[in-house]
Amino acid sequence: MTRLRKFESVFGENWVVGRYLLPALEKLGRAHTGVVLDLACGESPFRKCFPYARQYLRVDHDPLDAEVIRGDMRCVPLPDRSADAVLLCQAITDVPEPSAVLKEVRRLLRAGGSVIVFESMCYPEHDAPHDYFRLMPEGLRAVADTVGLQVRECMRLGGLFTRFASLWNTCLMGGLMRYRALRPIGLLGVAAGNVFCYALDRMAPHPRLASDYLAVLAPRDAALDLDSPASGSGN
C-alpha cells in the first residue's frame, strides 16, 4: 500500500489522520502557484495537494525515481531562493538537529515564501535509528525562531482517539499482518478501529489531546502570529 493510500483508504493505518490532514493540506496547497519543494519526499504522497504549482521539486536521501533530487535536507543541492514554498511532512524529527533543516529551508525560500510543516506528536517509533524525537508546536516555534522563521498558523489535527487508532493499527500491522492467512482479519480490524476512533473523535473533540499538527512558517519579518489551537476538521 502506497503512503498516500495509507491516508486515503479506510484499510490504511493513517486513515484517521488523513481525514484531518488531507483537507487542510489541500486547502493550503491550492494557494501555491509557484515552485514547491518537497523535502524528504519519499513516495511523494502529497503531490496532488498542490494542483496549481508551476513546478514540484522533490528531494530525498534515497530517491525512488529518477526525477527526485538526491540530497540531505541539511544540505540541499539547489541554489539560494529556489522555492516559493517548502513542504516538510514528518521530516525534521528524523534528523538530530532540526534547526539545521530549517536554516537550509530559510536559504532556499524566496521572498514572500512559506514553509508547510506536518508533524505527529505521538506517532510510534519508525525509521529507526533515524527517529529522534517528537516536536511539539511550541518546540517548532522555538527552533524556527533561531533561524529567523516564525509560525504564522498552527492547526491541531485529530484528538485522543486518533492517537489510539495510530497505536492500534501499528499493533495490527506488526502482528496479524505478518501472517498471510490472518491479513484479512487484520485489515478488517484496521478498518473497524479507524471508523470507531474517528467517530469518537468527532463526538468528543479535545484540541489539547491532538495527535498531529500542520503549521505554516514564514520569515519573521513577513509573518503574523496567528496560531489556531482548534482541532482541524475532516470531511
Which residues make up each language-model segment?
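Conserved N-terminal segment of class I S-adenosyl-L-methionine
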Residues: M1-D80, A85-C89, A210-Y213, R220-N235
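Short catalytic micro-motifs in class I SAM-dependent methyltransferases
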Residues: Q90-D94
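S-adenosyl-L-methionine-dependent methyltransferase catalytic module, highlighting the catalytic core
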Residues: S99-A100, E104, S114-N235
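GHKL-family ATP-binding catalytic core of two-component histidine kinases
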Residues: P77-P79, P96, M136
